[in-house]
Amino acid sequence: MGSLSEWVQQGWYKGSPWLVPLRPLSALVSFEARRRLQRFRKQRPRPPVPVLVVGNITVGGTGKTPLVIALVEAARSRGLKVAVVSRGFAGKTNHYPQHVTASSDALDMGDEPVLIARRTGVPVVLDPDRRNALDVAIREYAPDLVISDDGLQHYALPRSAEVVVVDAQRGLGNGRCLPEGPLREPATRLKEVDFVISTGGGWAGAYPMIMRPSGVTCLADNRTLTPDDFLRLHPQVHAVAGIGNPKRFFNLLSILGLSATPHVFPDHHAYQPADLAFTDGLPVLMTEKDAVKCAPFAEPHWWFVPVTASLPEGLLDQMLDRALGKE
């Protein structure tokens, strides 16, 4: 992680007096966020089809993508046609809208949209203007349900239900809005959404979500080992993570019993082969989100850990029912 980014995040989550002079700017961000939310409440446009927004109120990753995948799979198991809309953060393309498929380049389209397309096989429409992405998805794919990957603060996007994911390990930091703190909106926003989901531990008023590894897969040939089999063969590894909270991945590997040398990269990092050219020959283990970017130049000793979101029984159906207006 770059030193400036790391320094800022340490201030947000561990406290630092140098942030205090930024408070007036944070107050302006908080005021504007409240104003935009109030305007949205008054207008409250109805979406043409049910729209379920999965987002967060903090900067950085909280584990939204596994939840989006779980919701897509749950909806498809009910016979629903699903499309996903996304911004495609950190993708290189500047032509929109884009239709993301399993064969799309993650460096062009962004790692999360490509991961969703590969895991689910549903249409993914990319556009920073999420209202336009929604219109394109409806026109091109006639879905019964649209799930928005992020976009909670994009109030031009009409929605039927909102889900917020909170990283319980990091929490809301100092509770301040940008730039003094990590919040995109005031913490009171959590009281207004339909569901709050916590990853990495318990959170008051939230439903817990556990990331369960479904195996360890080789980037080069897609063969998969159980975590126990991988551990027996490779007890020591290099662990690579370019996600919002790398510690979450490293903790998972520790729980699996692996001895891992951690290597932290910025969220959405555009990997090059030299980034992973470790000289000791140990296997390299990474997140699935990192793997979609490293696959084009994968080596035989590079592996990733797919995870599945595990939630309380019936919760996925509750979220879908809320979005579909069945509650």
Curated annotation (Swiss-Prot):
* Entry GO MF terms: ATP binding; tetraacyldisaccharide 4'-kinase activity
Q: Does the UniProt entry include the keyword Coiled coil?
A: no
Keyword Membrane listed? The answer is no
**Residues involved in ATP binding:** 58-65
Q: What metabolic or biological pathway is this protein involved in? A: Glycolipid biosynthesis; lipid IV(A) biosynthesis; lipid IV(A) from (3R)-3-hydroxytetradecanoyl-[acyl-carrier-protein] and UDP-N-acetyl-alpha-D-glucosamine: step 6/6
Task of the protein: Transfers the gamma-phosphate of ATP to the 4'-position of a tetraacyldisaccharide 1-phosphate intermediate (termed DS-1-P) to form tetraacyldisaccharide 1,4'-bis-phosphate (lipid IVA).
The superkingdom listed in its UniProt entry is: Bacteria
Give the CC-aspect GO terms.
plasma membrane
Q: Which gene holds the coding sequence for this protein? A: lpxK
Taxonomic placement: Bacteria, Pseudomonadati, Pseudomonadota, Gammaproteobacteria, Oceanospirillales
UniProt-listed Enzyme Commission number(s)? 2.7.1.130
Task: Give the reactions, separated by semicolons, that this protein catalyses.
Answer: a lipid A disaccharide + ATP = a lipid IVA + ADP + H(+)
Keyword list, A-Z? ATP-binding, Kinase, Lipid A biosynthesis, Lipid biosynthesis, Lipid metabolism, Nucleotide-binding, Transferase
Its GO biological process annotations read:
lipid A biosynthetic process; lipopolysaccharide core region biosynthetic process
Question: What is the scientific name of the source organism?
Answer: Alcanivorax borkumensis (strain ATCC 700651 / DSM 11573 / NCIMB 13689 / SK2)
Q: Which InterPro entries match?
A: LpxK, P-loop_NTPase
Protein name according to UniProt: Tetraacyldisaccharide 4'-kinase
- Tell me which family the UniProt entry assigns to this protein: Belongs to the LpxK family.
